[in-house]
Amino acid sequence: MNNTALKNEKKPRTPVAIIGIGCRFPGNADSPESFWKMLCSGVDAISEVPQDRWNSQAFYSPDIGKPGFMPIHQGGFLSNIDLFDADFFGISPREAAYIDPQQRLLLEVVWEALENGGLVPANLVGSRTGVFIGKFAMEYHLMQFSEMQRELIGPHSSTGTLGTLLSNRISHWFDFQGPSIALDTACSSSLVAVHLACQSLWSGESDLALAGGVNIIFKPEWTLA
């Protein structure tokens, strides 16, 4: 075997252990256990579009391709996306109102994932923990920065709605010192986040990595598209 072959030979990688999980899925599956139970029971978590998202009947038409309308009025929706324990995270009610529910949700789920893995967040302060979050729709940002509603813009609008903060707020709040990346590769975003987390662990860049994804649709436009 020549030197070139030796260089090109792939070295075996240390297996990556998944030690904790946190989640939110339609059908009130708010933990790994409830999600597994839902799958085993064959529960259909698809429901009518909630009224607090949009009036589905106003946009419904069986005529596929009709501009401004959609041939569906159902989907997979999370419950209580407006609820957030701001006091727990030391965030004022005023600032919390500007924060994208996707950011709020990620803070809660990260805490739950660490607990699920038997990790104490205080013990991870300053650690080389990487955060990799897949994203897609950023509608809360569009809603606040609308030309028609500039009065909604406030002192926390940027940090509350920018996509990069989906990962950065986690790293900042928990004081993680590893890489902090929010990425968008459409439907593969969460999978790519896991891939990058593994690469970070294998390279020695991170000692611990959090990988996940979030996508909350507030308005009908993305479904229309």
Roles of regions detected by a PLM:
Residues 5-225:
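Cys-dependent condensing catalytic cores that perform Claisen condensation/acyl-transfer
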